[in-house]
Amino acid sequence: MSRIAQTFSQLSAQGRKGLIPFITAGDPYPEMTVDLMHALVKGGSNVIELGVPFSDPMADGPVIQRASERALAKKVGLRTVLEYVRAFRATDLTTPVVLMGYANPIERMGVDAFAKAASEAGVDGVLVVDYPPEECEAFAKTMRAAGIDPIFLLAPTSTEARIAQIARVASGYIYYVSLKGVTGAATIDLDAVAARIPQIRQHARLPVGVGFGIRDAATARAISGVADAVVIGSRIVQLLEEAPREQAVQYLTDFIAEIRQALDA
């Protein structure tokens, strides 16, 4: 059983919901990333999504775009991100780490070489935002062969056929994008999300995490009523962008603990 499957199995047995935070690797400071990952766990996260910086992050709003730019300016690329995971794994062998990013850096490294390097570093899942549907199957197969869960996005605009296709190739969990548009955008329509998740479950026997637009404990709590996990990205990246350097780790721990408390209430 993969680390991700094990995590969701334990959560289900405890009657709890998953908390999946996102941070951009290398932001706000490259030397802080591993400490931030540990802070996420300390606060009560179940899975970590680690963003791979990319020069044209088309699915991301201005907050995560700026984080990507800052990290790239400090020369943080895919190989550096894998080193962060390796360093994190030196003291944490249980928390799943999912790399989230775009196809270009993986294609440049080579899909097979990436699968091997990611597996050796201790990566558990990979979510590539911009792989077209027809390329998903080969990529997913390569990842699974390396012991990595291929994770895919579904959106309010996803057709029934697309949901069925993703259900066939995905493992780990499904990431449901609650809003049309980019990360960090408007507020969530809870009723629309609640209506959509049963459709996904008809096809996929995987946990469903919901992200985009979750900015506080109250929204996280509301979403957890209909989903298996909540994903929080832009709000965390913004918090780190604004935090004084020496307090960033503590700010992050406290914010995650607040969300965790709301999910467990």
From Swiss-Prot:
Catalytically driven reaction(s): (1S,2R)-1-C-(indol-3-yl)glycerol 3-phosphate + L-serine = D-glyceraldehyde 3-phosphate + L-tryptophan + H2O
Residues forming the catalytic site: 49, 60
UniProt cross-references to Gene3D superfamilies, sorted A to Z: Aldolase class I (3.20.20.70)
A GO CC term assigned to this protein in UniProt: cytosol
Record flagged with keyword Amino-acid biosynthesis: yes
Disulfide-bond pairs as recorded: none
GO MF: tryptophan synthase activity
Keyword Cell membrane: no
Pathways per UniProt: Amino-acid biosynthesis; L-tryptophan biosynthesis; L-tryptophan from chorismate: step 5/5
Cross-referenced InterPro entries: Aldolase_TIM, RibuloseP-bd_barrel, Trp_synthase_alpha_AS, Trp_synthase_suA
The protein's enzyme class: lyase
Keyword annotations from UniProtKB, A to Z: Amino-acid biosynthesis, Aromatic amino acid biosynthesis, Lyase, Tryptophan biosynthesis
EC numbers, comma separated: 4.2.1.20
PANTHER family referenced in this protein's UniProt entry, alphabetically: TRYPTOPHAN SYNTHASE ALPHA CHAIN, CHLOROPLASTIC (PTHR43406:SF1), TRYPTOPHAN SYNTHASE, ALPHA CHAIN (PTHR43406)
Assigned protein family: Belongs to the TrpA family.
Purpose of the protein: The alpha subunit is responsible for the aldol cleavage of indoleglycerol phosphate to indole and glyceraldehyde 3-phosphate.
Quaternary structure and interacting proteins, as annotated: Tetramer of two alpha and two beta chains.
Name of the protein described by the UniProt record: Tryptophan synthase alpha chain
Natural source organism: Ralstonia pickettii (strain 12J)
Gene: trpA
